[in-house]
A protein has these predicted regions:
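Short, Lys/Arg-enriched N-terminal segments with co-localized hydrophobic residues
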Residues: 1-13
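A conserved ligand/cofactor-binding region detector
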Residues: 10, 15-834
Length: 834
């Protein structure tokens, strides 16, 4: 039952009882264990106690909060047991540092992991409540934004499910990134006040508190160099427990909250300077306000630096403190601790760890560097040089003077290594130095991550190959064995079992329920792909999901869409390289073709977009506005009727994705070949039976190889062809002049056909395509339109489409985040999995 009697644990290690042994209840799958709590501990009783109302009268929110608290109590007990078992076995721990964790809602996942969905549903219905209404009122945790954060969330799910001793470390953002509103087709950012009613899942840890310094100076004393910060904050911990599935193991996401060393300047307050009196509190609070603050200003860049350092300082102090409590020494740190950097945003963990080992614990430089390299590993997520993070030396010198000294020393020793092993190669030295001397001197965070880590991985085979051939080619010469590949994955618990219960029921009938933790069992579906009964079941599940999404669109946007139409979906961060604009160009081409030949047998299609643009990214915002202008024109044109609809769903989130992805027929994965590191949305769509139209890029390649390229709609230039076209001199205007359809599309957009009140609105956007086209949309346009024609023809034959949908599902077994974590555990972290 959803009982409330489990203790919420005390102390930094949160341990109050012996670790589970084989055969203990705590070592058995969750579904085999049930509480025998008496009536007063039931969920309705807890609803009544927390709301002061009868369960029948309590609101869905009160039901959600009570269910969350009851679930949290059971998860806290599992946390207690997991941490105690890790200490007993002296297991090596993984610590995953990430600026974002896009967790989504937690209640549905917790109920599934605890095996309590049935009891929750029954209790809610007995009180006259709809379980779905209760689940719906939970806010998405605004701790992330895009693929980087969602990958981190999937990893925590798999770390827990595979029993890997693990902590995630992030910041407790007060307002997330932003809520996206659309006004007159334009993105408007508003604070995401997701914590206004508190977070029923988090456990505050007032006993876990670390000082975090800023600015100041470095002095030399009898024990060496020592940093004397001019400012000091404190980091307080909030724990979010991530349950494993078919196990009682959990992972812990520890989020840091900044507090001032002195909350109020009382002297200023007494003088009547109330703003000055509150300045210390404001300086601390702003650290946690927003994920990825606008960095177009100096103040914004400084805030980002402070956020990154605050995260890593608190996290590394916590890791070292836990290790010292367990072992009392640091010479075995690399044997018991793994710190993984999710991109370069947490890279300051490297000089922070070295500072703690050398300055605070008296370790020699060589010993500290050896431990650091054993501990640290780094995942790269981009192939674009301009996206690699750097920090001005002057900014680090002001805010983190001791860390800059340490970075200089790492670089000095690295360059001496190069002089020894690559004598006379001055070009190599310039390229791989941690300091970029061109213009304003800057520290290259990716370079620091490579030099100070023992492993560096890409996230798809193509990405990892290109990584060592292009942006990190010189580092691969120096460290040929340091680079590896671990292809991304997604958790099937959320992205299939939770998001798509209709399809999951069909899979259970065919395979049994174990596919949730053994996703490779999906391969058993491939020989059944032509089975008419399976095809009917898969198509029926898809239709039910499309009807659900159509209701959401009608409710939120007032637009009626036909569930029988082809749902063509592109949902992801709005960025030029992801090429939502190419999709929009095809929509215009299709619209023009329908107008020109209205009596042709057009396949009805609903094109669905969702995604946020970074607040300072003007071009991405212009693309959003163009899509809305196209939608406004197409959707009201009586000549089009229901043969084409365009929908933009605002404020993209995990919960919205859980509604959209199961309903998609076609998954748009359009990145310019060689630019998308991996992608995970592509995997989620295919797992739910959508077919992919996409470029030969990122994980699309491995997915096509697993499923069979004949079951994909691959189009466009490959990465090597992109490079060759650029090398020969890419002229996008030639494509415009030679393709009448493309010319008509661009002329219509540039001429104001979709913005009659402001005819020049998109002239600059079109000019950028004609004169530069950095992501080669015009080069791929004709192939994309041709691939879309193949989509139409195939969708018109449901049994053929269903066959390919089933084969896509069957081929996704290798794209579980469980497989990904097993690969990390084996090739990078050297930890055991269950």
């Amino acid at each position: 039952m959803l009982a409330t009697g489990s203790p919420e644990c005390k102390g930094n290690d949160m341990t109050t009882r012996p670790a589970p042994q084989a055969g203990d209840a705590a070592a058995r799958p969750a579904e085999k264990r049930r509480s025998s709590a008496p009536g007063p501990d039931s969920l309705p009783a807890r609803v009544e106690r927390e709301s002061g109302m009868a369960p029948e009268q309590a609101s869905p929110y009160m039901w959600m909060r009570a269910a969350a608290h009851a679930s949290r109590a059971q998860l806290a007990e599992r946390m207690n047991l997991s941490l105690r078992d890790d200490r007993r076995t002296e297991a090596k721990r993984v610590h995953y540092l990430s600026m974002e964790f896009l967790m989504g809602r937690a209640l549905g996942n917790a109920l599934a992991a605890l095996g309590l969905h049935g009891e929750f549903d029954a209790a809610a219905r007995a009180a006259g409540k709809q379980p779905g209404d209760i689940l719906e009122v939970e806010a998405d945790a605004a701790l992330g934004n895009g693929g980087l954060g969602r990958l981190a969330a999937c990893f925590l799910d798999s770390l827990a499910t595979l029993g890997v001793p693990s902590f995630g470390y992030g910041l407790r953002y007060r307002y997330g990134m932003f809520v996206q509103r659309i006004h007159d087709g334009q993105q408007i950012e508003e604070p995401d006040d997701w914590l206004r009613h508190g977070n029923p899942w988090e456990l505050e840890r007032p006993e876990v508190r670390y000082p975090v310094g800023l600015a100041g100076r470095v002095v030399t004393d009898g024990s060496g160099r020592r940093w004397l910060p001019a400012e000091q904050l404190y980091a307080g911990a909030y724990d979010f427990i991530v349950p494993g599935h078919a196990t009682e193991r959990v992972a812990v996401l520890r989020q840091w909250q900044a507090y001032p060393s002195q909350p109020v300047d009382f002297a200023a307050f007494s003088r009547g300077d109330f703003a000055g009196a509150g300045a210390p509190m404001l300086a601390a609070e702003v650290i946690n306000w927003v994920l990825y603050p606008d960095d177009s200003t100096h103040a914004g860049r400084e805030l980002r630096l402070k956020q990154e350092y605050f995260l890593v300082s608190a996290s590394v102090q916590d890791i070292v403190a836990r290790h010292m409590a367990d072992y009392g020494r640091l010479d075995n740190l690399g044997d018991k601790v793994s710190i993984h950097l999710n991109d370069t945003l947490p890279t300051l963990a490297i000089p922070e760890l070295l500072r703690i080992l050398i300055d605070l614990h008296g370790m020699t430089w060589d010993a500290a560097m050896a431990q650091c390299q054993k501990v640290m590993s780094y995942t790269n997520h981009t192939l674009m040089p301009e996206a690699l993070e750097t920090w001005p030396v002057s900014m680090l010198e002001h805010w983190l003077p001791r860390h800059l000294e340490i970075i200089y020393q790492v670089n000095d020793r690295f360059l001496k290594h190069l002089a020894l092993h690559f004598p006379g190669d001055e070009a190599l030295v310039r390229h791989v130095s941690l300091i970029d001397e061109n213009g304003e001197r800057r520290v290259k965070m990716a370079a620091l991550s490579i030099v100070a880590s023992h492993r560096v991985n890409g996230v798809s085979r193509l990405h990892s190959e290109l990584m060592v051939q292009t942006i990190f080619a010189d580092y691969a010469r120096v460290f040929p064995d340091r680079f590896c590949n671990v292809t991304n994955g997604v958790t099937p618990r959320r992205w299939l079992a939770q998001a798509n219960p209709a399809l999951s029921a069909t899979l259970d009938e065919r395979l049994g329920p174990q596919w949730r933790i053994h996703l490779d069992q999906l391969a058993q579906l491939a020989p059944q792909a032509a089975d008419p009964n399976l095809q009917r079941a898969v198509l029926a599940a898809k239709r039910a999901n499309k009807e659900r999404l159509a209701q959401l669109v009608r409710r939120d946007l007032g637009i009626t869409i036909d569930p029988a139409s082809l749902f063509d979906v592109q949902i992801k961060r709005i960025h030029e390289y992801k090429r939502q604009l190419l999709n929009a160009l095809h929509v215009v081409a299709r619209y023009q073709a329908i107008i020109a030949n209205p009596d042709a047998p057009w396949q009805p299609r609903t094109v669905i977009f969702a995604g946020k643009a970074a607040s300072a990214y003007a071009t991405a915002k212009t693309i959003i506005r163009l899509i809305h202008d196209i939608a406004r024109t197409v959707n009201i044109d009586p000549r089009v009727r229901d043969r084409l609809k365009v929908v933009y769903l605002p404020n993209y989130s995990v919960s919205l994705a859980e509604n959209i992805i199961p309903a998609a027929d076609l998954s748009e994965q359009l990145s310019t070949a060689g630019t998308e590191a991996s992608g995970t949305g592509n995997m989620k769509f295919a797992l739910n039976g959508a077919l992919t139209i996409g470029t030969w890029d990122g994980a699309n390649i491995e997915m096509a190889q697993a499923v069979g390229a004949e079951h994909f709609f691959i189009f466009g230039l490959h990465a090597e062809q992109v490079d060759e076209v650029r090398r020969l001199g890419y002229d996008p205007r030639l494509y415009y002049e030679e393709n009448a359809q493309l010319k008509a599309v661009l002329d219509a957009i540039a001429g104001g056909a979709f913005s009659p009140g402001d005819p020049g609105r998109y002239r600059g956007l079109v000019d950028s395509l004609l004169n530069r086209d950095a992501y080669m949309l015009l080069a791929d346009f004709a192939a994309y339109v041709s691939a879309q024609q193949r989509v139409d023809a195939m969708f018109a034959t449901p049994e053929v489409w269903a066959d390919k949908a089933i084969r896509n599902i069957a081929g996704m077994g290798g794209f579980s985040s469980d497989r990904t974590i097993r690969d990390y555990a084996r090739t990078i972290w050297n930890v055991k999995v269950q």
